Amino acid sequence: MKFKNKIFLVSLCLLLSVYVFGGTINGLPLHIKKLSDNVIRLWVGDYVSSTAVSALNTDRGIVVIDTTQCPTLDVQFRKIIAKKFGGKNFIYLINTHEHSDHTNGNSIYSDCEIFAHEKCAEGMKRTQADQQRVIGWYKEYIPKLEKQLSEAKEGTDNYKKIKEDIIVRKMNLKALESGIKQTFPTKTFKDKMKLDMGNMTIELFYMGGLHSASDIFVFVPEEGLLFTGDVMADVWLTDTPGCLQSFGGRPGIKRDLPLMLKNWKSLINRKEKIKDYIPGHWNGDLTYNGFVARYNYMETLQKEVKKAVKENKELKSLLTDLHLKTRFPKLAGTPGFTRDFVHNNNIISIWTEKTGAKSASNALAEMIEKKGLKKAVNKFRDEYKNGSKSKKCYYLEHEFNSLGYRYLNQKKYPEAIAIFKLNVEMYPKSKNVYDSLGEAYLKDGQKKLALSYYNKVLKMDPNNANAKKMIGIINQKK
């Protein structure tokens, strides 16, 4: 009998270890990492940048940090967490920020108090209002992925990556179509908050503006863990970093930068208490050096922008002075800093906070929406020439280029051509503006005009590979 009991216990342990530390959910590999005796981290997938949900086993009950984009996945996660910690007493849920891949599963914890920053609910409502557009995007994108899968070699990493992506997108689409019940935070804070959980303390810090308006850090000193949400990572574990790809402010998002830096610095000062930095997605890591380097970077930008505003410098010259590769060479090309526009957005965000100036390209887009294309462009051209908006708005070539491509991708060719033509007028020495205008004319079927602008690019830069390529394509179609 004792021998049979031993076999049963061993079998049970093996079964539980498979259930908790492996297996699959909806065809996706399940991963559960033990961060300490009282903390686990769960995610699905070997390739997709899925949200990593963490759970803390406290004296007062189980605390969960973040949910996923698909509530049915959170149902499974909750069962696993309860099994692991030997109880079903879930007491709190904490959202590190507003985005749907961290809040859509909140309804699964509607029996808990839900903690978040005071701006979180507002952001969740914006996401909810955008659901139909997202559904439409999924319906267009999934068939494209399925086509890619049919062309990929079975068994390769690329094949597995695409397959996982399809599973996740279909799960999310099904959840959206079935109607996700938004469950908003019930307890919010502005600066920081502390939760006494008996065997551990949970400290919440405002960190808004580097990923969303409602970013927070979650610090558990007794466990030596700092959960950083989607704000940053300095190591990518896959070639699809997803939400962790950019370390950048979003122009237009209101934030309290001094408060953010103050909270950030206070955590740097407690480095001896932090053993591990935990990003909001499984496929990124964060080190102490990366954590500090990004703080120093943001502090430098704040000081330099403040100085430039005081000296009446133009934003364009400031962007040149603070060029990523020359001013921050150790960060350039590292995770979060692989795209120049992200760095530029950090500068622009601080600039707009200090000056109150708005983006001229955004102002033009609003005018087009209200007045129609012709009236808006004529009014904008007049205001640019007489300088009436020079103090209220800032003008940047790349922002107008982005606006033009926004229209181009929407197949609004007259709007795209009009924007690119304005960019040519404002920045006649830039070869890129002619290249963009040539592309717009080509997509609109105006080959002669497209050819003339690509020839203009080639005249400015005889070795321009793209211009040569496009001229060749146009000539072949004649």
Regions found by a protein language model. Give the residues of each.
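Metallo-beta-lactamase
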Residues: G27, K34, G61-V63, Q69-P71, E122-T300
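Active-site metal-binding motif and surrounding structural segment of the metallo-beta-lactamase
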Residues: R60-G61, T72-A116, E272-I274
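Accessory terminal helices/loops
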Residues: E151-K153, D157-K174, N269-K273, G284-S390
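Conserved beta-strand hairpin/beta-sheet module of binuclear metal-dependent hydrolase folds
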Residues: I32-K83, I216-V231
